[in-house]
Amino acid sequence: MTFRMILAFFTLCATSLFFGANQIEWSLLPTFNEKAWLPIIASRLPRLVALILTGSGLAMCGVILQHIVRNRFVEPGTTGSLDAAKLGILVSIVMLPSSDKLERMFFAVLFCFAAGLVYIAIIRKVKFSNTALVPVIGLMFGSVLSALAEFYAYQNNILQSMSGWLMGDFSKVVQEHYEIIFLILPITLLTYLYAHRFTVMGMGEDIASNLGISYAMTAALGLILVSITVAVTVVTVGAIHFVGLVIPNLVALKYGDHLKNTLPIVALGGASLLIFCDVISRVVLFPFEVPVGLTASAVGGVMFLAFLLKGAKA
């Protein structure tokens, strides 16, 4: 992990923390004036924490999925995970109208995990001559789930409730209304503890079995970790694309595939990218905000396209 990456991360954190539409009386901060500190403690600090956890969590989800499927072009957005989580939340709203975030997250995890199993079953069933078809199948699968979610929402007259999950938005993250996102912390720790198993799993089922690692159990664990992270993210801030696709590929290109060494870099890169996108979202139409999900899709898409073009020239 280079010094420049760490410096860039803390610079972005400081920018995110001290930049916003609400004016802060900077001269009163050293006196610990409650009114001056309120915007930072109640809104900007929770937002920054949510950005860091979401960015790092989604980037690590991308790594896990890429090792399970053994394809560089998959992430939660190209495997149907985000759409499955959205469908799960809608079902929870209809079945349990008074459900809280924890209950909605539980439904989202179940739907996410089930969608992951179905996607992997499809990938294992079909023989692909081109690896680019793997994410295409995922996008088609996600489109089916998204259509089901929209039909279900329309049927139950809750179509407007979907708007918050279609595009990630951190503007509503405030103190005492985002703490569920801290569940990503133990997920990150577990991912690192099982990094060696995920690395071996990425080499293939035969090699994993020869090295004494249960491919099925490791893949199931990976899907559970991904499902929880995606569910927590969608419930708290909404769906965010490309973070889990761009960062793992860039890190693997420069540092290799040994996850024990690269996971901290992946987490830092994911957090930095999402904070950068959030700052752009606040600057473009200041004092108004663009949803971070829209900015992340634009920035991530451009970065990944540049990555592909560079690889094609090489």
Curated annotation (Swiss-Prot):
GO terms for biological process: siderophore-dependent iron import into cell. Its main location: membrane. Disruption phenotype: Mutants cannot transport ferric-anguibactin and are unable to grow under iron-limiting conditions. Keywords: Cell inner membrane, Cell membrane, Ion transport, Iron, Iron transport, Membrane, Plasmid, Transmembrane, Transmembrane helix, Transport. It comes from the Bacteria. One of its GO terms (cellular component) is plasma membrane. The chain crosses the membrane at residues 1-21, 49-69, 76-96, 103-123, 132-152, 180-200, 207-226, 230-252, 265-285, 288-308. It is found in: Cell inner membrane. It is a multi-pass membrane protein. GO terms for molecular function: transmembrane transporter activity. It holds the Pfam family FecCD. Belongs to the binding-protein-dependent transport system permease family. FecCD subfamily. Part of an iron transport system composed of the outer membrane receptor FatA, the periplasmic binding protein FatB and the inner membrane proteins FatC and FatD. Involved in the uptake of iron in complex with the siderophore anguibactin. Responsible for the translocation of ferric-anguibactin across the cytoplasmic membrane. This is Ferric-anguibactin transport system permease protein FatD. The lineage of its organism: Bacteria, Pseudomonadati, Pseudomonadota, Gammaproteobacteria, Vibrionales.
